[in-house]
A protein has these predicted regions:
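Structural signature of tandem-repeat unit edges
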Residues: 121-131, 136, 150-165, 174-188, ...
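Phosphate-coordinating loops and pocket residues in cytosolic domains that bind phosphorylated ligands
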Residues: 22, 31, 309
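A structural signal for leucine-rich repeat
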Residues: 367-368, 375
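Consensus positions within tandem repeat domains that build extended binding/scaffold surfaces
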Residues: 168-170, 191-193, 215-217, 271-274, ...
Length: 626
């Protein structure tokens, strides 16, 4: 009788549940979705009992538990009975089962209708639907939802407890966030997470955070006043609103609105980007004990006028003080061994640099390039190197290597009438007199000079004729680029590598035309019969070349913008049939050229499509005349 009674009760209960499901379309739909999708979802994956992964579950990024053996379901469902649930769900023992780790209140009801009790119930925090989730990582936000939600919290963004990571650029450029509070559970804050949040004022870092990127997390947060860290955090700390590692040996990030900072004596490293774009920073005190200043640490600190580097400092990294407002004399202490690329680039108010006795490298190598640490310091007049430095020296304010065989850099504001390069110099470095407009008069190059570097005299003030000694074996094509007062380049007839004709620089056999000086004055220019290649920008802005241009019949290649802005060339230019390669814009802005007559019947394959870009001349193909 008891057995019969139990069977009747079970049948009646099943009938009631079935009736409820049929009469409740929401419940019925949920049940159907559960019964079908839970068996077929992602079945192509090879997964194991209890393995967790992030998937798109019912349209939401959720964590689910994969079960491939019904015997293990009791780990996830209380009161589990294998036969009862396998029959109810219509699943076989060898089929994968997907069961949500966490469910909402609504989902819990239909699971209860099926007689299934999840081992945990997840109730979302207010505002969770404002974020784009990847599992438990926030990867972005829904703009209108977040804006509406923050309007109810006075701009306070409280990161949900569920969140373990704030991903790359998650909240970049969000102007309506004013305060950020992280909660226990958050582990990682990725690069650029809050970059350019212009109205962000404060940030609270919870005790659970283990990693904060040093790549512009709070860059451009110009109104940020304070970064505070929970005192129980094991990895990070804060002092006066500045973020440090726990031991305060590394200064990680300063708030964008900071005006003064007394760096603790415990700090050995100013981290990269630490004060980057802190435009209100007027004073920073660096104490002995500091050993390195990271890349871009004080970049664009445009109010920072005075910096005293401590006597323990060893390295100044890339762009460390790029475009800072350092004024007057800069002393590099004896302890400093390395100054990397662009460290003081565009520090336009430095007037003098004193280099200590142990500096070994500038710009990361023994040579100086375009990213020279002191280039474009427009008011820099003098380098002074201590005599006991083994790697560098100075003379008349110019920086050399130790034995003065290489001229490294003239300060941007260096002044001289008639420039005499010392007889010891074998190499004039890249960009060495770049932009030195106060270097005027003639330049005298010594016999024994071997090489002249990239743009070494570009945009400088030297004038008249330049005489190249017989000893020179290397001249970069841009060495005299935009040196607008040079009238001629003459090469010693005994030089084995170069030659000149009509003030134009060629290789020795005149098969390559390298450069014509800006102030070259010629009427009706005819190029030599031997010429095969005209280098790029060779006649750039040579506006004193007037009349016609005659190209020789052996010419093969004209490189990019070769005759750029030669506005004095006029009439008709005939392109020989021998020309097989033409790069872009060779007659760009040559407003006087009216016709370009090409011997070729159509554009050769080796001619760029934009070969006559920004030239309004009429082009004729298949020209057979004189």
């Amino acid at each position: 009788v008891l057995i019969i009674t139990i069977i009747v009760v079970i049948i009646l209960a099943a009938a009631v549940i079935l009736t409820i499901s049929k009469n409740n379309p929401v419940s019925s739909a949920k049940e159907a979705a559960f019964k079908e999708d839970i068996r077929s979802f992602q079945t192509e994956l090879s997964l194991y009992v209890g393995k967790q992964m992030t998937v798109d579950y019912y349209g939401n990024r959720e964590k689910i538990t994969v079960i491939d053996n019904l015997d293990d379901m009791d780990k996830y469902i209380s009161g589990y009975n294998k036969k009862k649930y396998s029959d109810k769900l219509g699943i076989e023992d060898d089929e994968l089962v997907y069961f949500p780790d966490k469910v909402t209140k609504d989902e819990k009801k239909w699971l209860d209708d099926l007689g299934i009790k999840p081992y945990s119930v997840y109730i979302p925090e207010a505002g969770e639907d404002c974020f784009i989730w990847n599992g438990n990582a926030i990867t972005g936000y829904y703009d209108e939802k977040l804006k509406e939600f923050l309007s109810t919290t006075n701009g306070v963004l409280k990161i949900p407890k569920r969140c373990t990571e704030i991903s790359y650029i998650s909240f970049e450029n969000v102007s309506y966030i004013e305060n950020v509070i992280t909660q226990d559970g958050l582990l990682n804050v990725s690069s650029k997470s809050f970059r350019n949040c212009a109205n962000l004022k404060s940030v609270y870092i919870s005790k659970s955070v283990r990693y904060i990127s040093d790549e512009w997390v709070f860059y451009g947060c110009s109104n940020l006043v304070s970064i505070e860290v929970d005192s129980e955090n094991e990895c990070y700390s804060s002092q006066d609103g500045v973020l440090y590692n726990k031991e305060k040996t590394t200064l990680i990030a300063a708030p964008g609105k900071i005006e003064e900072c007394n760096v603790p004596s415990t700090v050995k490293t100013i981290g990269k980007n630490a004060f980057s774009l802190c435009k209100n920073l007027k004073k920073v005190v660096l104490l002995d004990g500091l050993e390195s200043i990271g890349a871009r640490a004080f970049e664009h600190c445009t109010s920072l006028s005075e910096v005293k580097l401590p006597n323990t400092l060893k390295k100044v990294d890339i762009d460390a003080f790029y475009s800072a407002n350092i004024t007057g004399e800069l002393v590099i202490p004896d302890s400093v061994e390395s100054i990397e690329n662009s460290s003081f680039l565009y520090c336009t108010n430095i007037s003098k640099v004193v280099i200590g006795s142990n500096l070994k490298t500038i710009s990361g190598t023994s040579s100086i390039d375009y990213y020279n640490s002191f280039r474009a310091c427009s008011n820099l007049k003098e380098f002074v190197v201590k005599q006991d430095n083994k790697y560098f020296s100075s003379q008349d304010g110019i920086l050399y290597n130790k034995d003065k065989t290489k001229l490294i850099l003239a300060p941007s504001a260096y002044e001289v009438n008639d420039l005499y390069i010392p007889n010891s110099v074998k190499e004039i470095g890249d960009y060495s007199f770049y932009g030195s407009t106060n270097v005027k008069g003639k330049i005298y190059l010594p016999e024994g000079l071997i090489s002249i570097g990239w743009q070494s005299f570009s945009q400088c003030g030297i004038s008249g004729e330049v005489n190249i000694p017989s000893s020179v074996t290397s001249i970069k094509s841009s060495s005299f680029f935009n040196a607008e007062y040079i009238t001629k380049i003459n090469v010693d007839s005994n030089n084995l590598n170069y030659s000149s004709q009509d003030g134009i620089l060629y290789n020795k056999d005149k098969t390559e035309l390298i450069i014509a000086p800006h102030k070259l004055t010629i009427n009706n220019l005819t190029l030599p019969d031997s010429l095969k290649v005209i280098d790029g920008m060779a006649f750039d802005s040579c506006q004193n070349i007037t009349g016609t241009l005659t190209l020789n019949d052996n010419l093969e290649t004209i490189k990019d913008r070769a005759f750029y802005c030669c506005s004095g060339i006029s009439g008709t230019v005939v392109m020989p049939e021998s020309v097989k390669k033409v790069e872009g814009g060779i007659f760009d802005s040559c407003v006087g050229i009216q016709n370009i007559k090409c011997r070729a019947s159509s554009k050769p394959d080796g001619w760029d499509d934009d070969w006559n870009m920004y030239c309004n001349a009429n082009v004729v193909w298949g020209y057979t005349g004189d």
